[in-house]
């Protein structure tokens, strides 16, 4: 991994640089556990055609997280301490033009007991056989009934966006033959904490 971008602009370094520019006096570092174990600085994902993620959240602090760890186990993670958690996605390769309606759908919806009651185990296929997700049908009904606004994220290669990890979002399926390739990461901060942790 250390030599993957030799001779090129390293997108991981660019991400950390800009987080540092926006963070004021806070230190931006790769997350680590008290015993010294480090998290990954970012992850590269290859989303294949005809595959996507149903509604889900990514905040480690929340019971609706796609993590398989129990709520009790999650409180033991060093990244759990951060009140605010965000995800960041950089598009490296887009599917064929016209094969995808959008790259992501974001919902202006806070996690709550009603949404938590919609959680179910979903079969995803590929290397992630199953995960905790929000029931797509139930959530769509909830969104309509409560007039929850949505935003469709449409990216070009090189575009980077951030989203609140505690709000539901969807990665829609797309057609074609070319995979969508992204670099993704999460970061957390608390106003009073001098550090911003970045992890994948």
Predicted regions and their residues:
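Short edge beta-strand segments in beta-sheet-rich domains
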Residues: 39, 99-101, 178-182
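Catalytic core of non-heme Fe(II) oxygenases with the double-stranded beta-helix
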Residues: 50-150
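Catalytic core of Fe(II)/2-oxoglutarate
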Residues: 116-200
């Amino acid at each position: 991994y250390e030599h993957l971008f030799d001779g090129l602009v390293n997108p991981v370094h660019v991400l950390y640089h800009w987080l540092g520019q926006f963070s004021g006096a806070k230190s931006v570092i790769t997350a680590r556990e008290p015993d010294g174990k480090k998290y990954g600085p970012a992850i590269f994902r290859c989303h294949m055609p005809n595959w996507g993620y149903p509604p889900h959240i990514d905040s480690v602090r929340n019971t609706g997280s796609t993590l398989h760890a129990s709520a009790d186990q999650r409180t033991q993670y060093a990244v759990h301490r951060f009140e605010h958690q965000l995800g960041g996605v950089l598009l490296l390769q887009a599917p064929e033009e016209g094969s995808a309606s959008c790259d992501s759908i974001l919902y202006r919806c806070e996690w709550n007991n009603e949404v938590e009651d919609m959680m179910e185990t979903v079969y995803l296929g590929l290397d992630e056989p199953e995960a905790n997700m929000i029931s797509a049908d139930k959530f769509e009904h909830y969104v309509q009934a409560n007039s929850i606004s949505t935003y469709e994220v449409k990216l070009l290669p090189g575009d980077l966006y951030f989203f609140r990890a505690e709000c539901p979002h969807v990665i829609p399926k797309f057609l074609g033959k070319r995979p969508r390739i992204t670099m993704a990461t999460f970061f957390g901060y608390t106003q009073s904490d001098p550090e911003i942790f970045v992890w994948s």
